[in-house]
Amino acid sequence: MKFQVISQDKEARHGMFNFNGNIIETPVFMPVGTYGTVKSLNIEEIKNTGSKIILSNALHLYLRPGQDIIKLHGSLHNFMNWNGPILTDSGGFQIFSLSNFCRIKEEGVIFKNHINGKKFFLTPELSMEIQIDLGSNIIMIFDECIAYNKDWEKTKFAMERSLNWSRRSRIHFDLKKKNKKNLLFGIIHGGSYKSLRDISLKELIKMDFDGYALGGLAVGESKLEMHDLLDHITPQIPKKKPRYLMGVGKPEDLIESVYRGIDMFDCVLPTRNARNGHLFVTNGIIKIRNAKYKKDLSVLDKKCTCYTCQNYSRSYLHHLDSCNEILGARLNTIHNLHYYQTLMFNIRNAIKQKKFDEFVSNFYNQKK
């Protein structure tokens, strides 16, 4: 299950994972299936968008349906009938997103279950056990994600705690893993402070993770700040290891990050935006709720080969959205994910052909 960099165009990389015969080419975008499903789609529909690896959330699955239920099926893959690889998030981001429901201690985090109000204690060790029981192909260490604009002292304290939890995650993963083919990724923290990011990465490299993620981004910083940080930290990540930018993002974010050497992405944006009627097309975004689409008989995007664009008009999609029909969310999601996966396919081809700069230029020119 080794990662290989196959070709490179400046900093942009075309790579490959082999998960038991499932070949995953990078740069890759992973749709978010928090609860073991990409909202509104069945497995065949997910596959037909070109998606080959998905992300699920270990903490949310631990709360519902529960670790034991998934173990009855043998793995999360069996539970949801998905035969591709799965990456699971550890629950660290929920320290940020569910901050009103948790209290952080050095040993772990006391969460208040948002479903039934009961308290539970999540530790690095428990997070590893949950993810191992899920059968995750890529397991994320348990970390503390904080807001980007915290002061230096608070950011340093959180970064050091994440390093401590990373060591504990590494030890417990090595002790409990059932399969040598599971991968464990470390997460680089340090907020907006390059010196703290440097320390975080240096210590994580000593722990020899299978890949390295950049955490604590897409949480309020500007694009320029994110790009500046990527320019600084990405070249320091071991070249033979995959680089994962968590929670990012818009199509232009993916392109700018690939340009800076990132290999892996996940984000709720294409699926969440689809449910809100924001659809990505070659020349920008269509807000299908706009009344001007009521009598528009054209397809969403003439260049798109997705099921939605091959079968339905903008007028029909506008109608479904105005009636709040479930089918509307489904067709929109199919389109947005297909758009993202086609974008990644074209990015990979451009890197292979050493034409990534030309691809980037054409991408932005189409948006004008």
UniProtKB/Swiss-Prot annotation:
Its cofactor is Zn(2+). Zn(2+) binds at residues 304, 306, 309, 335. SUPFAM superfamilies: tRNA-guanine transglycosylase. InterPro entries: ArchSynthase1/Queuine_TRR, TGT, TGT-like_sf, tRNA_ribo_trans-like. GO terms for molecular function: metal ion binding; tRNA-guanosine(34) queuine transglycosylase activity. GO terms for cellular component: cytosol. GO terms for biological process: queuosine biosynthetic process; tRNA wobble guanine modification; tRNA-guanine transglycosylation. PANTHER family: QUEUINE TRNA-RIBOSYLTRANSFERASE. Homodimer. Within each dimer, one monomer is responsible for RNA recognition and catalysis, while the other monomer binds to the replacement base PreQ1. This is Queuine tRNA-ribosyltransferase.
